[in-house]
Curated annotation (Swiss-Prot):
It is found in: Nucleus. The keyword 4Fe-4S does not apply. May be involved in transcriptional regulation. SUPFAM superfamilies: beta-beta-alpha zinc fingers, KRAB domain (Kruppel-associated box), Retrovirus capsid dimerization domain-like. Residues 166-234 form the KRAB domain. Keywords: DNA-binding, Metal-binding, Nucleus, Repeat, Transcription, Transcription regulation, Zinc, Zinc-finger. PROSITE patterns: KRAB (PS50805), SCAN_BOX (PS50804), ZINC_FINGER_C2H2_1 (PS00028), ZINC_FINGER_C2H2_2 (PS50157). This is Zinc finger protein 287. A zinc finger (C2H2-type) spans 366-388, 394-416, 422-444, 450-472, 478-500, 506-528, 534-556, 562-584, 590-612, 618-640, 646-668, 674-696, 702-724, 730-752. The keyword Metal-binding applies. Residues 42-124 form the SCAN box domain. It comes from Mus musculus (Mouse).
């Protein structure tokens, strides 16, 4: 069926409305006006533009109002609203001319549209019959363009649908020359990728479309060859005038004044193609005298290859596709083929060689010029390139950092500007991101929505729960590349790596001391401020850090929550467990650069360094005595304040140091863990074992500087030195007599008490 016959029928035939019952002229007029108003509201809703100034919230409100005016839920039922949506979709899938004509009849329902189209089909079939009988009888049967099946002539609707269902301009992304010049390279690449992706989506649906050149030709030198003076195809919208390079175009075989109608459609018969050559969707004039088929089969690997071999193609200027310019290249067989710089399937640019004909199994001729990944089909390459184009498309102008999403870039820029728009209403603290404010507010509300399924412990942040769960699983995903030590937290790995690099980026503004961890700096700064906000409820002792308070409270509770998996021994502190575990592994990864001595802990190495430097940073504020270790200062301060926090549960005796309490408890338990390998004698204290060993070896390491007399024990040397100094530190409180040794004082006190020495 020729398109002109369809146009004449649509122009002349005015069907009557399908009546649902008796209706007056006034009711018909009112119904027609109501339908026109409904159609106007629908168009206002569908064509509503996004107002840049008003903002998204106001735009959404306006769009919702337009939708209510169209669907009218206060009047229509759910079934009626559903019918309106189905009617709209049904009208949208009709062929272009039929859709326009049906819309002009203002149908009330989908059934009425069906009736209109069926009546139109019947009329066209009746007019088709006499035209088919009037065809010339000498048509050769072997004509490839001749269709002997009359049924195909009656399928006018499917032909129109094939030609009118989708054109490339329906899905094209139009830009102006000014937009193209302002585009960054990443967005230009995205524009090319999206355009080719739309083309391949249409090809995959079996639609006959002609492949555009993706790279815009706005900056290339063009000259006008021929203008199309007739009206454009209804499917196209006016664009800037496109021009072609003269050097690629042969002389046209038409008069310069002849006009070409882009809206003319054509079928397989090609009887009327002599006077005016057909024009494809991108302005190609086809002058092959044997004609061509719009619905010719396209090759799966090269959809334009078979079609391009049938005819010569000439480029004409038209008022359309400035942004999708087409170039030409002469082949060896004097045929003209399309190509573009975006490496199409029939270009050898993307695959490293000529890709012609069918691709053999296993071949992957299309490669990504970004990462080198290869693909068998070109649409797969296009989809892959689109991912590259979207990757980190937003760049910070301050530091050059790139982001994948615009929202991430906006949040990042607040680091440079210092903007903190999200403020806590309870304490006034401000944050740069809303998520940080949400997490902070849980401090005030006490909310802990994340719960550990193993132990039931609650957390305010998901990240804290994830870190905690590693204590149950034993997972340590972070590994040091230097010593292969693993950690459960990334922050622990970063802190550990500073042991190898020696980096100490955190500096105290008061004394200039540097630290490898920020927490250590915060702890150190409390020495200058003297602030101790954490208080024990049992003994009222105060601490500068909460961790110190927690450790101290375990003295009162006796809790030992850290257990060694090797021997089962339990400890109150995790650091003590770590120290103990090195006795099983024998690992000593911390080495002194001065003497080469190795240690199992970094703290021990730090303390050892002070023996070389003589540094004693911990000073007593009462007597001024300095110490190399903080624990020694803490123990010394108990001499001044009389504190003895370590108490024996058996006899009640108290001690200043926990080690002294441990040694004392062996008196009650009878434990003697230190055994001599020579005679088998056991001792409570390690110092007693060391003194006993000297009886076997004869070693006397302690020498008097006055008389050169040597001793096996340090206490014996101290007592001997009092002979030279005359010091008598042990005085009787009753008579005031002084003695050089404590044993002599004890014997003297029996004189006052009357006690006798037992033999």
């Amino acid at each position: 069926m020729a398109n002109s016959s369809l146009s004449q029928v649509l122009l002349m035939w005015k069907p009557g409305k399908i009546q649902k019952g008796p209706c007056s002229a006034e009711q018909q007029t009112l119904t027609s006006r109501l339908l026109r108003d409904t159609e106007t509201c629908r168009r206002n809703f569908r064509n509503f533009p996004y107002p840049d100034v008003a903002g998204p919230r106001k735009a959404l409100c306006q769009l919702r109002e337009l939708c209510l005016k169209w669907l009218r839920p206060e009047v229509h039922s759910k079934e009626q609203i559903l019918e309106l949506l189905v009617l709209e979709q049904f009208l949208s899938i009709l062929p272009g001319e039929v859709r326009t004509w049906v819309n002009s009849q203002y149908p009330e329902s989908s059934e009425e549209v069906v009736a209109l189209v069926e009546d139109l089909t019947q009329i066209l079939e009746e007019e088709e019959a006499p035209q088919s009988s009037a065809l010339p009888q000498d048509t050769p049967e072997d004509d490839p363009n001749h269709d002997p099946n009359p049924a195909s002539q009656a399928g006018w609707l499917s032909d129109v649908v094939t030609k009118d269902l989708v054109t490339f301009n329906d899905v094209a992304v139009d830009i102006t020359q000014e937009d193209w010049e302002l585009m960054p390279p990443v967005q230009k690449e995205l524009y090319k990728t999206v355009t080719l992706q739309n083309y391949w989506n249409m090809v995959s649906l079996g639609l006959t479309v002609y492949r555009p050149t993706v790279i815009p030709v706005l900056e290339e030198p063009w000259m006008v060859i021929k203008e199309i003076v007739e009206g454009p195809n209804p499917e196209w919208e006016p664009k800037a005038q496109a021009q072609c390079p003269a050097k690629h175009l042969p002389e046209l075989k038409q008069d310069g004044t002849q006009t070409v109608k882009l809206e003319d459609s054509y079928d397989d018969d090609n009887d009327d193609s002599v006077e005016s050559p057909p024009v494809c969707a991108f302005g190609m004039i086809h002058i092959d005298e044997e004609g061509f088929s719009v619905k010719s089969e396209l090759s799966q690997e090269d959809p334009t290859e078979e079609y391009l071999s049938k005819c010569d193609i000439y480029r004409v200027t038209f008022e359309k596709h400035t942004n999708l310019g087409v170039q030409f290249d002469t082949q060896s067989d004097d045929k003209t083929a399309l190509y573009n710089e975006s490496k199409p399937p029939f270009s050898n640019a993307s695959s490293g060689g000529a890709v012609r004909g069918k691709i053999l199994p296993g071949d992957k001729p299309y490669s990504c010029n970004v990462c080198g990944k290869q693909f068998r089909k070109y649409p797969s390459l296009l989809a892959h390139r689109e991912n590259h184009a979207k990757e980190k498309a937003y760049e910070c102008e301050e530091c050059g950092k790139e982001f994948k999403h615009l929202s991430s870039l906006i949040a990042h820029q607040r680091m440079h500007t210092g903007e903190k728009p999200y403020e806590c209403h309870q304490c006034g603290k401000a944050f740069s991101q809303r998520a940080h404010l949400t997490i902070h507010q849980r401090i005030h509300t006490g909310e802990k929505p994340y719960k550990c399924e193993d132990c039931g412990k609650d957390f305010s942040q998901r990240a804290h729960l994830t870190i905690h769960q590693r204590t149950h699983t034993g997972e340590k995903p972070y590994k040091c590349l230097e010593c292969s030590k693993t950690f459960s937290h990334s922050s622990s790995l970063i802190n550990h790596q500073r042991v190898h690099t020696g980096e100490k980026p955190y500096i105290c503004n008061e004394c200039g001391k540097t630290f490898s961890q920020s927490t250590h700096l915060l702890q150190h700064q409390k020495i200058h401020t003297g602030k101790k906000p954490y208080k024990c409820n049992e003994c009222w002792k105060v601490f500068s850090q909460s961790t110190y308070l927690i450790r101290h409270q375990r003295i009162h509770s006796g809790e030992k929550c850290y257990k060694c998996t090797a021997c089962g021994k339990a400890f109150a502190h995790s650091s003590t467990l770590i120290q103990h575990q090195t006795t099983h592994t024998g690992e000593k990864s911390y080495i002194c650069n001065v003497c080469g001595k190795a240690f199992s802990q970094s703290a021990n190495l730090t303390q050892h360094h002070r023996t070389h430097t003589g540094e004693k940073p911990y000073k007593c504020s009462v007597c001024g005595k300095a110490f190399s270790q903080s624990v020694h200062l803490t123990q010394h301060q108990r001499i001044h304040n009389g504190e003895k926090p370590f108490k024996c549960n058996t006899c009640g005796k108290a001690y200043r140091q926990g080690a002294n309490l441990t040694q004392h408890q062996r008196v009650h338990t009878g434990e003697k863990p230190y055994k001599c390998h020579h005679c088998g004698k056991a001792f409570i204290y390690s110092s007693s074992l060391n003194q006993h060993r000297r009886t076997h070896t004869g070693e006397r390491p302690y020498k008097c500087s006055h008389c050169n007399k040597d001793f096996s024990q340090r206490t014996c040397l101290i007592q001997h030195q009092r002979i030279h100094t005359g010091e008598k530190p042990y005085g009787c409180r009753i008579c005031g007599k002084a003695f050089t040794q404590s044993t002599n004082l004890i014997q003297h006190q029996r004189v006052h008490t009357g006690a006798r020495h037992r033999n």
